[in-house]
Amino acid sequence: MKLWGGRFRKAENQLMEEFNKSFGYDCVLYKKDIEGSVAHVHMQVKCGLLTEEEGKSITEGLKGILEDVENGKLVLDGEYEDIHSFTEINLIQRIGDVGKKLHTARSRNDQVAVDMRLYAKEKANDLVGLISEFKATIKDVADKNPVMMPGYTHLQRAQVVTFKHHLMAYYSMFDRDEKRIKNAIEILDESPLGCGALAGTTHDIDRSITCEQLGFKKVVDNFMDGVSDRDYLLELMSDFSIIMMHLSRLSEELILWSSQEFGFVEIDDLYTTGSSIMPQKKNPDGAELIRGKTGRVYGNLFGLFTVMKGIPLAYNKDMQEDKEGFFDSVHTLEMCIQIMDRMIATLKVNEDKMKQAVKNGFLNATEVADYLVKNNVAFRDAHGIVGSIVIYCEDNKKAIEDLTLEELHKFSDAFKEDIYDFIDYESILNKGIKKNLK
């Protein structure tokens, strides 16, 4: 049974039928489809399209379908065109012809639009919760590890920072991500139910009833936009892509830092794997998979952009292609955030390795220049002097702080005994606004 027909002289081609079906993936919308239908029935009764008795029968039938799906008595499988067909066909089989009245004053166009908004809103709120928990994990691990480490530019050692400050940079990123998703929720929080196929309905319905029951902030302003808008999915998927980019950057650092070449951190065994041939290997597969799956989420976003770019108003079947990519991106992001949260929570920080890397990289060179500036040397001259000192240190395999005052005087008479305290790494982190690094 289909929800359409009558005007066709030929039955649908079997290949076309398979090509047209979406039930294999839009079945995940079953809760939202039933939730939206229950609200629609409530509105139908209020507006005189159904009697109280009819409304009660349909509502109980819908809730029975939901209960049976939840407890496994009714399986989301079969030759249904889509989730809407599944719901309506099973309803009619349960309660008889009165179930055929469910679709009065509704189209699958506004039905799927409300299903997707409800689903997107719920999943977006779930992600806000996951990000909030992840931020708490980041802050906890950062606060417990205020140890010094090299800060990098161009992946070259640059200046001394702290692991805490480095990790809290990601806190700032994910804090912005959380705000972006909350903003997207605010924008999508409009009900399209009642828009019909594209032009509303001749029935004197009240869209505010379903809007309020479904928890939306307001109804959409335009019927045609209401059924053809997928901006909210594009916005959320853009936000997802930015989050994945941030997760990928953090993954890359964990991969580098956990290598023997760095040794700054150790990823817990729970989130690593081994090699089938090399017994010694401990591979950061959790982080690598997050890095790899970032491209997958990007691809889903650009796939939907491409779907939507040439569609005239209003609904077109192309829009069926909005679902798989969105569902996949949501699932991927949920998994990646949770895996990263656990990796960070169980991360072991190697303080000694980080300190050793600081001392081997001339990371106090900028502070040597600052010292000269404080002693009336122009910064550009100071910059050149310190560059020459670094070359001298490299040639003689020394750190700047290990040079004698006599050696330093070869480059400038501005150096005094207090230079050593000034460029001590712990001392550096207590000067000026660098105190904010700790």
From Swiss-Prot:
Query: Which pathway does the record list?
Result: Amino-acid biosynthesis; L-arginine biosynthesis; L-arginine from L-ornithine and carbamoyl phosphate: step 3/3
Keywords for the protein's UniProt record, in alphabetical order: Amino-acid biosynthesis, Arginine biosynthesis, Cytoplasm, Lyase
Which reaction(s) does its UniProt entry say it catalyses? 2-(N(omega)-L-arginino)succinate = fumarate + L-arginine
User: GO biological process annotations for this chain's record?
Assistant: arginine biosynthetic process via ornithine; L-arginine biosynthetic process
- GO MF entry, a single one: argininosuccinate lyase activity
Q: What is its EC number?
A: 4.3.2.1
Under HAMAP family, the record lists:
Arg_succ_lyase
Which family, according to the similarity comment? Belongs to the lyase 1 family. Argininosuccinate lyase subfamily.
List the protein's name: Argininosuccinate lyase
Native organism is Clostridioides difficile (strain 630) (Peptoclostridium difficile)
Q: Read off the lineage from the record.
A: Bacteria, Bacillati, Bacillota, Clostridia, Peptostreptococcales
